[in-house]
Curated annotation (Swiss-Prot):
Post-translational modification: Phosphorylated as part of a basal defense response.
Family: Belongs to the PAP/fibrillin family.
Protein name per Swiss-Prot or TrEMBL: Plastid-lipid-associated protein 6, chloroplastic
Transit peptide feature range: 1-72
Ranges where the record places region Disordered: 1-47
Subunit text: Part of the Photosystem II light-harvesting complex (LHCII).
GO cellular component, as recorded: chloroplast; chloroplast envelope; chloroplast thylakoid; chloroplast thylakoid membrane; cytosol; nucleus; plasma membrane; plastoglobule
Gene Ontology biological-process annotations: chloroplast organization; defense response to bacterium; response to ozone
Compartments where found: Plastid, Chloroplast, Plastoglobule
Keyword Zinc-finger: no
Positions in coiled-coil regions: none
InterPro entries referenced in this protein's UniProt entry, alphabetically: PAP, PAP/fibrillin_dom
Disruption phenotype: Increased susceptibility to ozone and to bacterial disease.
Length: 284
């Protein structure tokens, strides 16, 4: 056949080809580069198996060096994971220096809102009906949009301690047990005292029970407040603060509250309060 003889004329003698697989002869390397036929189409009939491998090897080299295949697409879960990781870092960089929102300006609030919405959109709708265990654990409050306005951004069940005595707020946590349905708001506080007494350091735990409403709304019901002193008074055992009777409880503090979980993964959680308060938590 003409095609076979033409192809054979391009190949060197078998001994020369078999003697050096690492550097195929130039005639093979350049004669195959313009061909568009399959790599194995013309080798099997005239070249022994070992020479066929050597020729195929040089053909692959030419193909990669000349017209390379397109890189694999980054779409799918891998690309989504990278995008979400970048958006999480963006949100953290926006809110990390705001002292949980206490020193946030109007511009800071807007930047935090935009960064949170981008992450919420990328994460998609939250459905906790089969994944309630995503809430399990102790979460540290990193940011609250309500703190900048000195508002708590919605109804807050529990004792209105801040109205009775001056309180300086420290770290705030949420401890959630999806099995017992316990939902504890834990706040490190410093209670003011008249001079010359030092302020009282304590940890207040507002115990609740929670239930899931729909796919992502959490309703909490207040049960009790427990205080554990620290510092010089750490030897005092924990004690409960009596719950106010319903007749004395202000209308803004009905004993229940709710919020929506708008984003959650293994390390971060975003919630929206019943008055739109944005909160960002990280796993403790």
């Amino acid at each position: 056949m003409a095609t076979s003889s033409t192809f054979s004329s391009l190949l060197p003698s078998p001994p020369a080809l078999l003697s050096d697989h690492r550097s195929p002869p130039p005639s093979i390397r350049y004669s195959f580069s313009p061909l568009t036929t399959p790599k194995s189409s013309r080798l099997g009939f005239t070249v022994p198996e070992k020479r066929n491998l050597a020729a195929n090897s040089s053909l692959v080299e030419v193909s990669i060096g000349g017209e390379s295949d397109p890189p694999p697409s980054s779409s799918g879960s891998g690309g989504d994971d990278k995008q979400i990781a970048l958006l999480k870092l963006k949100l953290l960089s926006v809110v990390s220096g705001l002292n949980r929102g206490l020193v946030a300006s109007v511009d800071d609030l807007e930047r935090a809102e935009v960064a949170a919405k981008e992450l919420e959109t990328a994460g998609g709708p939250v459905d906790l009906t089969d994944d309630l265990d995503k809430l399990q654990g102790k979460w540290r409050l990193l940011y609250s949009s309500a703190f900048s306005s000195r508002s708590l951004g919605g109804s807050r069940p529990g004792l209105p301690t801040g109205r009775l005595i001056p309180v300086t707020l420290g770290q705030v946590f949420q401890r959630i047990d999806v099995f017992s349905k316990d939902f504890d708001n834990i706040a490190e506080v410093e209670l003011g005292a008249p001079w010359p007494f030092p302020p009282l350091e304590a940890t207040a735990t507002l115990a609740h029970k929670f239930e899931l409403l729909g796919t992502c709304k959490i309703k909490i019901t207040f049960e009790k407040t427990t205080v554990k002193t620290s510092g010089n008074l750490s030897q005092i055992p924990p004690f409960d603060i009596p719950r106010l009777p319903d007749s004395f409880r202000p209308s803004s503090n009905p004993g229940t509250g709710d919020f929506e979980v708008t984003y959650v993964d293994d390390t971060m959680r975003i919630t929206r309060g019943d008055r739109g308060e944005l909160r960002v938590f990280v796993i403790a």
